[in-house]
């Protein structure tokens, strides 16, 4: 065999080896994830706002549930719920005894006179026979299960330090009242309920987060009678007329001290009004998504201070419903002095925000509770996970 033929054979052999190695390398590349795939796998989820970034996307959230007690923002940021208490597991979906609730039921845990972090053993639909009264230093944590409360709402009356998280509350009725377990002592008489999904009265340090609220007889969330230090965040409001009432009457002067934050919530186009409706107090409404309304989005009377910052308002198509705001109980010369301010809001489909007053000089308490607003055009991303989350232990939520 000549030198020329040997060279051809050597060249062919080297080329064949190179192709085989390249094929094997390709197989390895196919098996090993790309850096982007690895990043996505490690993340498992994306947290889009400051509250969610505090706890979401951590695979050990179920083993470290009470870390959520460090995550509140806004005027309810001092709320820790049952962080320093025991874990109480709801094992029964029954609510057949509202006078002496059985251990293992939600009502039993909610009325204990000690800090508790309440979780759920499995998916549950709990048909409440009466309103669910919750005592101080409690967290009702629905993560890891699909938890629905039906017929009865939650009442927080003269309590402190309560978190309500990841609960779906709907189809709430007016219930007759009677003797109801309301604390660690014997059951006490209670009046007929108002038919609110969540009713907060005379209470402070309250945080309502990642709840889905719909179809109540009265309001979805009512806060009144001197309640303060409240944050309502990451919630989805849907299929209802009146969403959020902050201050129940123009004669309830105790609501002058009320401070409430609404952040990262979605108000769907099936909500008509009160998103929120405010009286007397100081309200920061920040980075919420208003997907049309029937009557108005933000309303009020009795000279409340309302700071609307970085919200997205999409007006309904009807030409006479473009106004975001509704002021009642005063003529224009008076309400034009009320401090209703808009900053970096996004107004779409002809939405109109008629500002009034001037930028208020904030007190130390108000400064301490203010949240940093993101630009309004970021709201779809900030609110994309509003409402109840689907969480599984051992995986990012």
Swiss-Prot record:
| PbH1 repeat locations | 159-202, 203-224, 227-248
Q: How is the cofactor bound?
A: Binds 1 Ca(2+) ion.
An annotated Gene Ontology molecular function:
pectate lyase activity
Report the EC code(s) recorded for this entry: 4.2.2.2
Any single Pfam family the record assigns to this protein? Pectate_lyase_4
Q: Which domain of life is it from?
A: Eukaryota
User: Any S-S bridges, and between which cysteines?
Assistant: 54-71
- Keyword Ribonucleoprotein assigned to the entry: answer is no
Outcome when changing residue 70 to D: Detected only in flower DNA
What glycosylation sites does the entry record?
36
GO terms (BP aspect): pectin catabolic process
Q: Which residues bind Ca(2+)?
A: 194, 218, 222
Active-site residue list: 274
Signal sequence range? 1-25
Phenotype upon changing residue 138 to T: Detected only in flower DNA
Post-translational modification remark: The N-terminus is blocked.
Q: Which reaction does it catalyse?
A: Eliminative cleavage of (1->4)-alpha-D-galacturonan to give oligosaccharides with 4-deoxy-alpha-D-galact-4-enuronosyl groups at their non-reducing ends
Recorded metabolic or biological pathway in which this protein acts: Glycan metabolism; pectin degradation; 2-dehydro-3-deoxy-D-gluconate from pectin: step 2/5
UniProt keyword Metal-binding, yes or no = yes
- Keywords, in A-Z order: Allergen, Calcium, Disulfide bond, Glycoprotein, Lyase, Metal-binding, Repeat, Signal
Instruction: Summarize the subunit comment.
Output: Monomer.
The family annotation for this protein states: Belongs to the polysaccharide lyase 1 family. Amb a subfamily.
Q: What does this protein do?
A: Has pectate lyase activity.
Could you identify this protein by its name?
Pectate lyase 4
Origin organism of this chain?
A: Ambrosia artemisiifolia (Common ragweed)
């Amino acid at each position: 065999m000549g030198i020329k033929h040997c060279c051809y054979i050597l060249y062919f052999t080297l080329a064949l080896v190179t192709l085989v190695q390249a094929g094997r390398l390709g197989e390895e590349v196919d098996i090993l994830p790309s850096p982007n795939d690895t990043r996505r796998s490690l993340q498992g989820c994306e947290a889009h706002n400051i509250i969610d970034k505090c706890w979401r996307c951590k695979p050990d959230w179920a083993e470290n549930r009470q870390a959520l007690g460090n995550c509140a923002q806004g005027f309810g940021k001092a709320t820790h719920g049952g962080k320093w208490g025991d874990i109480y597991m709801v094992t029964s979906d029954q609510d057949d005894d509202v006078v002496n609730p059985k251990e293992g039921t939600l009502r039993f845990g909610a009325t204990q006179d000690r800090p508790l972090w309440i979780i759920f053993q499995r998916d549950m639909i709990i048909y409440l026979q009466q309103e669910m009264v919750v005592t101080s230093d409690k967290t009702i944590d629905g993560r890891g299960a699909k938890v629905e409360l039906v017929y009865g709402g939650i009442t927080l009356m003269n309590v402190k330090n309560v978190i309500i998280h990841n609960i779906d509350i709907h189809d709430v009725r007016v219930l007759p009242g009677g003797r109801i377990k309301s604390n660690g002592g014997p059951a006490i008489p209670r009046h007929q309920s108002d038919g609110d999904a969540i009713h907060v009265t005379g209470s402070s340090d309250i945080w309502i987060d990642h709840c889905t609220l719909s179809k109540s007889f009265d309001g979805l969330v009512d806060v009144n009678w001197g309640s303060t230090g409240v944050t309502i965040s990451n919630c989805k409001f849907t299929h209802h007329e009146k969403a959020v009432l902050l201050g129940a009457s123009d004669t309830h002067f105790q609501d002058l001290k009320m401070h409430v934050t609404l952040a990262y919530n979605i108000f769907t186009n099936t909500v008509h009004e009160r998103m929120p409706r405010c009286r007397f107090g100081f309200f920061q409404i920040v980075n919420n998504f208003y997907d049309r309304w029937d009557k108005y989005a933000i309303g009020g009377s009795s000279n409340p201070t309302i700071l609307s910052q970085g919200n997205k308002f999409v007006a309904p198509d009807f030409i006479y419903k473009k106004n975001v705001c509704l002021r009642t109980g005063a003529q224009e010369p008076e309400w034009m002095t009320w401090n209703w301010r808009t900053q970096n809001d996004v107004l779409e489909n002809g939405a109109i925000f008629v500002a009034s007053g001037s930028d208020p000089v904030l007190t130390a308490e108000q400064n301490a509770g203010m949240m940093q607003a993101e630009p309004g055009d970021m709201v779809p991303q900030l609110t994309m996970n509003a409402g109840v989350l689907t969480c599984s232990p051992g995986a990012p939520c």
